[in-house]
């Protein structure tokens, strides 16, 4: 984790949004960013605005899921928290949680860019190394 980071929050709210709807949203984003289907896994996590909440990982594209220093040798990289929106969040938006549901994600953009371009160290994005930074013009 870095002191400064960039994130993108997304949520969908409707009358029949489910965990499956959230997975479709995640897969669609990944397919648009990477141009292919990406293996995703969900681990239980706690976030006060979701119920249930998940840590969402993607297969490490630097090593193809085989394990490397980028993914801590386990083949996966954590890219976002997310989950089904907590009923209290819906209530605060004047939505009846008996009628409305939603799914929320918070994408770590630095990590997606790392995977998209095969960058092996997130700290490079915040460095003053112009040789590295200028390749993203």
Regions found by a protein language model. Give the residues of each.
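TRNA-recognition modules of translation machinery and tRNA-sensing kinases, especially anticodon-binding
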Residues: 1-137
């Amino acid at each position: 984790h870095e002191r400064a980071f960039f994130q993108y929050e997304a949520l969908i709210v409707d009358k029949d949004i489910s965990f499956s709807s959230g997975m479709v949203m995640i897969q669609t984003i990944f397919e648009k960013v990477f141009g292919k289907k990406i293996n995703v896994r969900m681990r239980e996590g706690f976030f006060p605005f979701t119920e249930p909440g998940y840590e969402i990982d993607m297969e490490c594209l630097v090593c193809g899921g085989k394990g490397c220093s980028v993914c801590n040798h386990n083949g996966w990289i954590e890219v976002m928290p997310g989950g089904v929106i907590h009923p209290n969040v819906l209530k605060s938006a004047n939505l009846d949680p008996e009628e409305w549901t939603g799914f929320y994600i918070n994408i770590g953009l630095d990590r997606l860019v790392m995977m998209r371009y095969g960058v092996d160290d997130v700290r490079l994005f915040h460095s003053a190394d112009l040789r590295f930074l200028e390749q993203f013009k």
